[in-house]
Swiss-Prot record:
It is found in: Nucleus. It comes from the Eukaryota. Keywords: Coiled coil, Nucleus. The lineage of its organism: Eukaryota, Metazoa, Chordata, Craniata, Vertebrata. Residues 431-778 form a coiled coil. PANTHER family: CILIA AND FLAGELLA-ASSOCIATED PROTEIN 58-RELATED (PTHR32083), COILED-COIL DOMAIN-CONTAINING PROTEIN 110 (PTHR32083:SF32). This is Coiled-coil domain-containing protein 110. One of its GO terms (cellular component) is nucleus. It comes from Macaca fascicularis.
Length: 833
């Protein structure tokens, strides 16, 4: 990874952290507003439309503020590197020129002894340092306490540079933490900030000019404002975000389980063949009003769930952006360690040269044990070695003050110089061992980087799958729009069919009244048939009498032959009339039977129509609930798509801004390096201050090792989250397949409803025609009772065919199966609820 991309990614991390915290606060506000009821649904929608604009403005301000912080961190890193190199150079110069260093340290140590013994000072510092790094959670509180103590101790002991140095670092760290949490710094204010940091130390009691200069205080100020406080806030924000996302996911999981249960009910209802044959009925207006009322309540209840799902999708997108940005912090520290490694290599070469020049120094067993001791002893124990060094320098200073030129004192001086050089060599070897440990840490960090690259390669196919899913969602949205239009047309048609059914009910009532009239007419016809039968009996009796008269009048046959012929003709006519009367009687009996059958069939049809109407109402209710659930799912998918697009746009804008900032940073670094080189030349005389800064750098390296451990844990978390995201993608694909199946089932259901509506209209027309034919026939019979005896053969044939068609019509058959299917559907819905 190139060093130019590091500041870009750091700024992106900072900006995304603050935006995530803002969205967390807004999501908590949405949770509280969601419980207030359905009256504030419209207000929540308007607020959600305003929030994205305000969020963009907030993100812009946050980007500007964190650009300034990034500039400061880069300057601090460069200062720390320059201090390390200067300290190492000074240690090597002291080894090469031991007399110069000893004289300087003698003059410096004498001033320290005048005010306060060094043993107490260094002991207090070592205890404070060990206390300072025991617990990372209580770091800020301990620093504030120590800074308060440092002000008191400085007022008492003005000329103590080591104690003043340590306390200045503590006060600076507390001040930088407060500044980073409370103040928004713009890039144009960098010079003012540095001036404020310099002026901050004017409140403390100033040391003499021989001990510490103002340029040195500026260097200390800049070197202490380091990156680790940013990392600490980064981890805390991520933990808060993950915790809130888990809570919101649990709420969404509950709603998702409800939707899955409804989808299972839909599939069971639609796969049942008995239910599919019952989709022939319409809703009444009363039930339709109830359904609309329930639908409005469900929409008001689902507004809050939609808002929560939007917030969760935004947070997930931000977390997905944050996860790769965690790696940038670790890589930043890795580059810092690499630079330290380069410095260590240069120091190793210089050490070899010094060993060649210092072959005269004897290496005894005691020196070897001292070197081992220095390699094992922790960093805060080096202060004790510094104390002994100052004591030896004070003893060396006495011959110069007394001006005794004896050989004994010169030998003591050379022996003490040799001991000082041995201690310097031990310290250099301790630094080399420490750099080796940093190299091992760098290897571990490179391994972690390789793991991160593998994870990124695994993320690429997931990105392609999300893009394909987005395309599928767009196609499904188009199909759903078409289905919504079809639904509106079908609803208009259903309203028309409801009106037609009302008219049919009115006509059926009229038919029942006319049927009652026909029953009265049938009774009168039966009475007439009884009278005709009596007349027939009388005619038979008369015919018998005539036969008896024929026997009596055989004698008169010759006279009455003509009359007999006439009578025979009349008898034949009477016989034909009798046959016609018998046929008419049979026809009337058949008609009465048919009318009774029609009555029973009409009553059965009325019951069937009522049952069908109830079934159609329930089926429409179920279809509406299914469509509502599908619309809700589609809205959530749309919201996720919009959130992804907004995050992509924000990332593109952030990249452009970062490229511009990199150019400004490069120019600023070139000017800053020139200024810092001049200040470092003035600071070479202050070796004790740099030794203290070496101890602090060691502590910072320990912090880096802790950061490496944190990166390991972060990598494990990233792996777990990868698994979770892959599982979620599988769930989304399954849900999309279910939606496609539900869509196909809904289309088939709509087609079946249209076919049933057409069949109902056709049957109603047939009923109207039959009713008109029956009414015409009844009117003709009622108006011409005398002519009713003479019914033509053609009318008889038409009436018989009508009866046959009525018996074989499909409306009289599926009653039992429809009732069974209706009862099954009702039982299932009760069980699910």
């Amino acid at each position: 990874m190139s060093p130019e991309k590091q500041p870009q990614e750091e700024d992106e991390v900072d900006s995304v952290l603050l935006s995530a915290s803002k969205i967390l606060n807004s999501s908590e506000g949405v949770k509280e507003s969601g419980c207030s009821g359905t009256e504030y649904g419209c207000i929540a929608e308007s607020e959600n439309q305003i929030q994205p604009q305000s969020a963009l403005k907030v993100l812009q301000h946050q980007l500007e503020s964190f650009q300034a912080l990034r500039m400061q961190t880069l300057q601090n890193v460069s200062m720390v590197q320059s201090e390390i190199s200067e300290i190492l150079n000074k240690s090597i110069i002291e080894v090469e020129n031991p007399q110069f260093g000893s004289e300087k340290n003698l003059a410096f140590g004498a001033r320290i002894e005048k005010d306060l013994p060094t043993e107490n000072q260094e002991g207090n510092l070592s205890m404070e340092k060990s206390r300072h790094f025991k617990d990372s959670k209580t770091l800020h509180s301990v620093e504030e306490k120590l800074s308060g103590d440092s002000v008191n101790s400085l007022s008492q002991n003005i000329n103590v540079p080591s104690q003043m140095h340590f306390e200045d670092t503590l006060t600076l760290r507390t001040s930088t933490d407060n500044l980073s949490s409370n103040i928004i710094i713009h890039p144009s204010e960098n010079s003012d900030i540095l001036k404020n940091y310099n002026n901050f130390y004017h409140f403390l009691p100033t040391a003499p000019q021989n001990v510490m200069s103002q340029a040195d205080t500026v260097i200390l100020d800049k070197s202490k404002i380091t990156v680790p406080f940013l990392k600490h806030g980064f981890c805390e924000n991520l933990d808060d975000i993950c915790h809130s996302i888990e809570q919101m996911k649990e709420e969404l999981q509950k709603s998702h389980d409800r939707e899955v249960a409804l989808a299972n009910e839909l599939q069971t209802l639609k796969t049942d063949p008995n239910v599919q044959s019952n989709d022939k009925y319409d809703l009444s207006p009363i039930h339709q009003e109830k359904m609309n009322f329930i639908k409005e309540e469900n929409m008001d209840g689902n507004l809050n769930e939609d808002i929560k799902s939007k917030r969760i999708s935004e947070l997930e997108a931000l977390v997905n952006k944050l996860l790769p940005f965690r790696e940038t912090v670790s890589k930043f520290h890795v580059n810092f360690c690499r630079k330290c490694k380069k410095l260590s290599k240069s120091e190793i070469h210089r050490g070899k040269r010094n060993e060649k020049n210092n072959k005269e120094i004897p290496i005894t067993g005691k020196n070897i044990t001292d070197l081992k001791f220095h390699s094992r002893v922790p960093r805060y124990t080096l202060s004790f070695l510094d104390q002994t060094k100052h004591e030896m320098k004070d003893k060396e200073r006495q011959p110069f003050l007394v001006k005794q030129g004896s050989i004994i004192f010169e030998n003591e001086k050379t022996s003490k110089v040799n001991s000082v050089t041995e201690q310097c060599v031990a310290k250099i070897q301790y630094l080399q061992n420490y750099l080796k440990e940093s190299v091992q840490i760098q290897k571990k960090v490179t391994e972690l980087e390789n793991e991160n690259l593998n994870l990124k390669s695994k993320m690429k196919p997931l990105i392609f799958t999300t893009q394909s899913l987005i395309q599928k969602v767009e196609t499904y949205e188009k199909q759903l729009k078409n289905l919504v239009e079809e639904k509106s047309t079908i609803q208009s048609k259903l309203s028309k069919t409801e009106e037609d059914s009302k008219e049919c009910l009115k006509e059926l009532k009229k038919i029942i009244g006319k049927y009652n009239v026909l029953q009265g007419q049938n009774k009168t016809l039966e009475e007439k048939n009884i009278q005709l039968s009596l007349e027939k009996q009388q005619m038979m009796e008369a015919f018998d009498q005539l036969k008896s008269k024929e026997h009596k009048t055989q004698s008169d046959m010759a006279i009455v032959n003509n009359e007999n012929n006439l009578m025979s003709i009349e008898m034949e006519a009477m016989k034909t009339n009798i046959l016609l009367i018998q046929d008419e009687k049979e026809m009337l009996e058949k008609k009465t039977h048919q009318l009774l059958k029609e009555k029973s069939s009409l009553e059965n049809e009325l019951k069937e129509n009522q049952l069908e109407v109830m079934q159609l109402k329930e089926k429409e209710r179920l279809a509406k609930t299914e469509q509502e659930t599908l619309l809700q799912i589609i809205e959530t998918v749309k919201d996720e798509k919009l959130n992804l697009e907004t995050t992509l746009q924000e990332s593109a804008a952030a990249r452009q801004i970062m490229e511009r900032e990199i150019e400004n940073i490069q120019t600023y670094q070139s000017t800053a390096e020139e200024n810092f080189l001049q200040e470092i030349k003035n600071a070479k005389s202050e070796a004790s201050i740099y030794k203290n800064s070496l101890s602090e750098i060691g502590k910072e390296c320990e912090m880096l090792s802790k950061m490496v451990m944190e990166t390991k844990t972060d990598n494990q978390i990233l792996k777990e989250e990868l698994k979770k995201h892959s599982q979620e993608n599988v769930k989304f694909e399954n849900s999309i397949s279910r939606l496609t199946e539900d869509k196909i089932l809904l289309e088939n259901y709509v087609r079946s409803i249209e076919n049933e509506r057409d069949t109902l209209e056709f049957e109603m027309r047939n009923l109207q025609r039959e009713y008109l034919n029956l009414s015409d026939k009844i009117c003709s019979q009622h108006n011409d009772p005398s002519k009713s005896t003479y019914i033509s053969r053609r009318e008889k044939f038409h009436f018989d065919n009508y009866i046959h068609e009525d018996i074989s019509s499909p409306r009289s058959r599926p009653l039992a199966s429809d009732l069974k299917g209706y009862l099954k559907v009702k039982d299932r819905t009760l069980k699910h609820h």
